[in-house]
A protein has these predicted regions:
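Non-catalytic, mobile gating and regulatory segments of ester bond hydrolases
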Residues: 2-202, 209, 213-240
Length: 240
């Protein structure tokens, strides 16, 4: 706050202060309303976009990936339109959800997804690839999705911990193993991605851990930036 106001020095006005106060207190839905009309060509990908795509990665695309049709190739808007009724059902959308205090990913992801696709900024983001692995023997609860922005940049989003025992067991394993199977899978997923593209890697919670781990371990320097939103046990990664 101080840095922002110092930039304006004696020229600062109550208008600047009020506008910055509004920006500082925005949530994701406010951001979509404020910047949703700007494509990525005009306003480049930023940390809030990373947060939104990290949350959207929690949506259970596997419900349709395994049952009806492949999700790859669709824009987010096309995907939601195609599966609109099921998105509501699987997401259990509550129109009155408190986005600031009720942050259970499975509940908020469908809500934010359906809101985001109504904006120019997110509607034309294309789903390039999706992978979901749940293996009790190997102790893996892993999901990742690759998006392509309207400017051609790709974003790999790693999903965090779900409500399964396997997912929580993974979190515990992160505290004493140098590498868990899910981290190895995260690196493998990125290394199998298409070359010749510019990438961002993002994730929330365990997904943030996998994003940073992948960034450190990847074979090629193809990543422009990595955003780990509340990535768990990041300190352990930095000691590897």
């Amino acid at each position: 706050n101080k840095r922002f106001l110092d930039l304006f020095g004696k020229h600062k006005t109550s208008i600047f202060e009020e506008e910055f106060h509004y920006v500082r207190n925005m949530n994701m839905l406010d951001y979509l309303d404020w910047r949703g009309d700007l494509p990525f060509e005009r306003d480049p990908f930023n940390e809030v976009d990373a947060l939104i795509l990290s949350l959207i990665s929690y949506y259970e695309y596997e419900q349709f990936y395994q049952v009806t049709t492949d999700v790859r190739g669709y824009t987010l808007a096309e995907y939601v339109k195609l599966h609109e009724d099921n998105v509501q059902i699987f997401g259990e959308i509550d129109k009155n959800i408190d986005i600031e205090n009720d942050i259970v990913p499975r509940k908020t992801a469908p809500f934010v997804l359906c809101t985001a696709v109504k904006t120019e900024r997110f509607a034309n983001i294309r789903i390039v690839d999706f992978r979901n692995i749940f293996d009790e023997e190997r102790v893996i609860q892993f999901a990742a999705i690759t998006f392509e922005l309207s400017d051609g940049i790709r974003v790999v989003a790693y999903r965090g911990t779900d409500s399964s025992i396997i997912g929580w067991k993974e979190d515990c394993m992160l505290s004493y193993l140098r590498e868990i199977p899910g981290q190895a899978e995260a690196v493998r997923y990125f290394n199998e991605s298409e070359t010749g593209k510019k990438y961002y890697i993002v994730g929330h919670s365990k997904g943030g851990n996998e994003a940073l781990y992948t960034y450190i371990k990847m074979k090629e320097e193809r990543v422009d930036d990595v955003v780990a939103v509340k990535g768990i046990l990041i300190g352990f990664i930095l000691l590897l």
